Curated annotation (Swiss-Prot):
Record keyword Isomerase present: yes
Gene designation: ulaE
EC top class, as a word: isomerase
Protein task: Catalyzes the isomerization of L-xylulose-5-phosphate to L-ribulose-5-phosphate. Is involved in the anaerobic L-ascorbate utilization.
The protein, known as: L-ribulose-5-phosphate 3-epimerase UlaE
Amino acid sequence: MLSKQIPLGIYEKALPAGECWLERLRLAKTLGFDFVEMSVDETDARLARLDWSREQRLALVSAVAETGVRVPSMCLSAHRRFPLGSEDDAVRAQGLEIMRKAIQFAQDVGIRVIQLAGYDVYYQQANDETRCRFRDGLKESVDMASRAQVTLAMEIMDYPLMNSISKALGYAHYLNNPCFQLYPDIGNLSAWDNDVQMELQAGIGHIVAVHVKDTKPGVFKNVPFGEGVVDFERCFETLKQSGYCGPYLIEMWSETAENPAAEVAKARDWVKARMAKAGMVEAA
């Protein structure tokens, strides 16, 4: 794994739904992936993972050891429902408690990176106060992550507050902590009026992983690869030439499809072909 030029992973929600991680990791291995990214979203079912018992956590660690397929990252989107910028103190406190539990969970099972959703609020109206509370919440979260030696990494979003690497870098400079980095989504980055290549170059040195998906302006999910606006070859070329050597994660939501494995295999082949064209020869 350490000698592999391009670590390639798959998002949990691309694979069949369920709570058996041994089965999920075995399938990911069969499909040729190096790792799976766990989702902890705003649903009660996935939030419940943060309250797993010691035995449940050990079962995940054991599944990783048995298959050799890692779970190095968590997509923590639960803060849509419990935002750190909420003006409701009880909701905001719940958001911070979710963060604490997520960091503890990551520490227990070996997750290194928690991808954060860059929303001050999601279902409410944003304002100066929600942004201030969000900044303060991030500061408290990064302090917790530092003590646990876990990295928090901001996603580039489908939301104006965090829709460019430049904006996320502003938070990185404000927090000034090595445990806060960036986790750009080249689909989200491309769907806005960004100079995508310049943005990617600006983030080098702070990018710990990259989400790979296609998008259209205003459409951020479930756009089939090749039908959106993302110039994948140029993005891969820019990242390669800038010296980025980290993982790539194919983000899909095919868990309820008739044949999720077939959908994932098709997307994998499409993405790897673009990587090969970009000179990432090991991807072919």
